[in-house]
Amino acid sequence: KDAQATLLQQFEAAYNAKFSSTRGIEQATAMYYLEKLVNLENADAAWLLYQILGEEGASQRFMRLAALGDVAEAQLAFAMSTESPEKREKWLVRAASQQYLPAQAALADWYLLHGQQHLAKPLLAATATLDMQSAFKYARLLWDEGEHQQAKEHFTFAAKQGHAQAEKALEAVQLYTPYTLGQLASQPTPPTWLDNPDCLQRIQPFATSLATIMRAHSLYSSFKADTRLQALSICLAKPIWLQADALNCHPNYQNTGVLGCNITPLSNIAKKHKFSHAVVVSEQGKANVQNGVMYLDISDAYSVFVHELAHFAGFADEYPIGRSMANKLC
């Protein structure tokens, strides 16, 4: 085993040096002896041979043997190569258990994708000080759990590393404060449009999470900078950040197939703030307009917002409408 380890060290050094002549080991020689070691079920040799041959030229057998031999890099590669969710999670867990940073980050992403934040959190905690993407995701989890000061620290770390979304998160928490419906009702009426005769449409955006207030602020900023719309009699207020339990929203609201919310709690706010239309930015769902309320999710581009804005002006749609719908509308 010592002899095998010595050979592997020499071959790995030659591989890292791209088999330059100064190392004295040619690629063909290394591959010959690595094949011999693979036949002895040497997992590290299998992984090195897989790397030398490349993904296209290597046999899956080398990757699998290396993974079975607890080579963390191979376990991660093997996990990402399978289409089976069960196998992927199994090999991600095995690789992450060896404290392999990329595997821990990948497993955290897997858990987040499947809504298992409680499993992702300890993995992100372990990698947050080493990786800006993990720091950002960990900060998001902390914020949602009410650990705002810790969240800001990790957002700051990620932002200093150049993470653009972390910078936007810090901007959002500096500009906005989440309100309960009761707190919002006690706030003074914004003076923006009360004395402005050009505000024939007074639109108030709402958000209920850090992610959605970030998106709402981005839409608000884009609208303010959009010279195409400045001549219209439309006024858009600064977004309001409501606490998470203020609105009951669902991506398939009342089985309609589109995003929607129970907006009854906003009725008193609408009377006090004098807005004629509302925009609700939610986590997920298909954009639409219903009864003077525009529903968007965090993935909707500014162009979608402008498209839906046309519905507020009375336009049905920009494409031909079917006969039955045309008869109904006209």
Model features per residue range: what roles?
Residues W143, K152-F155, E167-I269:
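Propeptide-to-catalytic entry region of secreted or membrane-anchored zinc metalloproteases
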Residues L247-D300:
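Active-site scaffold of zinc-dependent metalloenzymes
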Residues N291-A301, V306, H311-C330:
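The catalytic-center signature of Zn2+-dependent metalloproteases
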Residues A3-T6, K18-S20, N39-D44, G54, ...:
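Short helix-capping/linker turns of helical repeat alpha-solenoids
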Residues A30, A58-S59, R88, A120, ...:
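Single-residue signature of alpha-solenoid repeat helices
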